[in-house]
């Protein structure tokens, strides 16, 4: 991919005309005085980092549940890696780096314990009450469940950050108002009554680079963790031509290299190639679109920051590799079954006996709720658990807890 370096931003502070402007933000649900020392998007990023939800990411699984090593990624380390890539993309494209980083930092807040397995289990038990969606849960956390301020629930983020959180993967509804990937989660619809996030349009370019940064990070780093865990071998990586080419390049430059450094050199090159591909495609799309404002990005009928067709095919091949050798590995499937049982058991126990929830706030506030509201309340409590907390809760309440090691 050819990149016009003259068109790149290298931290000079210059913003493109299509970048989001923190000084003309659409504001916050609850109006506040501005800061003398920080932009509105800087304040958002800082608020996100200081939440309890951000701290809990440290003990939530990315892929490997209860791993036997300290070097596997958690939701927190993954989030930090996504934020770094998003910020690099934003700088190169002359976007607002703080907004891109903020969306990246908050994008996984709604994830349950035990990764996507926990989300699937919680979605299944909550299906009669609207189901569970981690993006919608992220929105609930930052607009309702975080209790830090005297004047409101949530952390009162700007419209742009909330929009990016909800729409970083694209519009949620089509021109007819129909859900593009199924019904729009109820928490998103409820919030849009208070503050319209315009879920039928694309998000800002800052949100788009956060989304593609997520793809780059988890593809690359799941390979790294898979190699460490022994689920992947270098021979398996040869199945993907792009990775095979990178391996040949590293071997040619460093004929004698230990396995750990060899893997790191592959990962470094993979990230670099993918980032440069996105920058090149975005530049081409911007030249075609000729946007004069952030609104022009939202009004476009396509994603501006994305992979080229060739890199998209590589992305597909990598996902196939990961699904075949890691996500559907018999040992991972065994652990996933145990995690599903833990989440399901806890949900039904708390629905039957809310007093088992070890928090005065969660127990006291459930009084008088309808069954649907009670289920959502229990779902909020479960979704906020870390892996270790959920395990301990199950061990306390049940005679047998699945072994997730």
Swiss-Prot record:
Biological classification of the source: Bacteria, Pseudomonadati, Pseudomonadota, Alphaproteobacteria, Hyphomicrobiales
The protein's name: Deoxyguanosinetriphosphate triphosphohydrolase-like protein
Assigned protein family: Belongs to the dGTPase family. Type 2 subfamily.
Pfam families (alphabetical): HD, HD_assoc
Database matches in InterPro entries: dGTPase, dGTPase-like, dNTPase_2, HD/PDEase_dom, HD_domain, PHydrolase_assoc_dom
Alphabetized UniProt keyword annotations: Hydrolase
Species per Swiss-Prot/TrEMBL record: Agrobacterium fabrum (strain C58 / ATCC 33970)
Domain of life: Bacteria
One of the GO biological process terms: dGTP catabolic process
Residue stretches making up the HD domain: 75-219
UniProt-recorded Gene Ontology molecular function terms: dGTPase activity
Keyword Cytoplasm: no
């Amino acid at each position: 991919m050819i990149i016009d370096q003259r068109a790149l931003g290298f931290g000079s502070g210059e913003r493109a005309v299509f970048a989001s402007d923190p000084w003309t933000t659409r504001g916050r649900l609850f109006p506040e005085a501005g800061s003398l020392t920080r932009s509105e998007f800087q304040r958002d990023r800082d608020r996100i980092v200081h939440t309890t939800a951000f701290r809990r990411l440290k003990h939530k699984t990315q892929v490997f549940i209860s791993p036997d090593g300290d070097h596997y990624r958690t939701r927190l380390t993954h989030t930090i890696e996504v934020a770094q890539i998003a910020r690099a993309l934003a700088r190169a494209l002359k976007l607002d780096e703080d907004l891109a980083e903020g969306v990246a930092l908050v994008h996984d807040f709604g994830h349950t314990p035990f990764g996507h397995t926990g989300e699937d289990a919680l979605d299944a038990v909550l299906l009669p009450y609207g189901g569970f969606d981690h993006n919608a849960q992220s929105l609930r956390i930052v607009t309702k469940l975080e209790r830090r301020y005297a004047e409101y629930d949530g952390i009162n983020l700007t419209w742009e950050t909330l929009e990016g959180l909800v729409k970083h993967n694209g519009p949620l509804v089509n021109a007819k108002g129909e859900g593009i990937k199924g019904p729009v989660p109820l928490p998103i619809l409820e919030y849009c009554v208070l503050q319209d996030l315009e879920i039928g349009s694309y998000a800002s370019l800052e949100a788009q680079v956060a989304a593609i940064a997520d793809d780059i990070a988890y593809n690359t780093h799941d390979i790294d963790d898979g190699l460490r865990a022994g689920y992947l071998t270098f021979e398996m990586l040869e199945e993907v031509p792009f990775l095979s080419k990178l391996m040949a390049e590293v071997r040619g430059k460093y004929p004698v290299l230990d396995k750990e450094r060899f893997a790191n050199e592959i990962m470094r090159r993979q990230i670099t190639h993918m980032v440069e591909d996105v920058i090149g495609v975005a530049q081409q799309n911007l030249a075609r679109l000729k946007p004069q404002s952030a609104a022009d990005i939202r009004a476009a009928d396509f994603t501006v920051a994305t992979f080229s067709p060739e890199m998209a095919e590589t992305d597909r091949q990598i996902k196939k590799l990961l699904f075949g050798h890691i996500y559907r590995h018999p040992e991972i499937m065994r652990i996933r079954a145990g995690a599903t049982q833990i989440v399901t058991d806890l949900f039904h126990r708390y629905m039957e006996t809310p007093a088992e929830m070890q928090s005065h706030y969660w127990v006291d506030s459930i009084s008088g709720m309808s069954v649907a509201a009670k289920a959502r309340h229990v779902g909020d409590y479960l979704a906020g658990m870390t892996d270790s907390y959920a395990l301990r809760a199950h061990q306390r309440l049940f005679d047998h807890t699945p072994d997730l090691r």
